Amino acid sequence: MTLTGKVKWFNSEKGFGFIEVADGSDVFVHFSAITGDGFKSLDEGQEVSFEVED
């Protein structure tokens, strides 16, 4: 299931952060889950789409 949300915060040095989804809950994100080339980071307020894994 693909969800969308906004990056609540992301610590590039530690490599993790949280994304806030529409219902107000937070989803943990680790840098290893970020797709794309180059440095893997997210900006606060950035709109993202993602899949949740158990």
UniProtKB/Swiss-Prot annotation:
<comment type="function">
    <text>Can bind to ATTGG and CCAAT motifs (Y-box motifs) of single-stranded oligonucleotides.</text>
</comment>
<keyword id="KW-0238">DNA-binding</keyword>
<comment type="subunit">
    <text>Homodimer.</text>
</comment>
<dbReference type="InterPro" id="IPR019844">
    <property type="entry name" value="CSD_CS"/>
</dbReference>
<dbReference type="InterPro" id="IPR012340">
    <property type="entry name" value="NA-bd_OB-fold"/>
</dbReference>
<dbReference type="Pfam" id="PF00313">
    <property type="entry name" value="CSD"/>
</dbReference>
<protein>
    <recommendedName>
        <fullName>Cold shock-like protein CspE</fullName>
    </recommendedName>
</protein>
<dbReference type="GO" id="GO:0003677">
    <property type="term" value="F:DNA binding"/>
</dbReference>
<dbReference type="InterPro" id="IPR012156">
    <property type="entry name" value="Cold_shock_CspA"/>
</dbReference>
<keyword id="KW-0963">Cytoplasm</keyword>
<dbReference type="GO" id="GO:0005737">
    <property type="term" value="C:cytoplasm"/>
</dbReference>
<keyword id="KW-0010">Activator</keyword>
<dbReference type="InterPro" id="IPR011129">
    <property type="entry name" value="CSD"/>
</dbReference>
<dbReference type="InterPro" id="IPR002059">
    <property type="entry name" value="CSP_DNA-bd"/>
</dbReference>
<keyword id="KW-0804">Transcription</keyword>
<keyword id="KW-0805">Transcription regulation</keyword>
<feature type="domain" description="CSD">
    <location>
        <begin position="5"/>
        <end position="54"/>
    </location>
</feature>
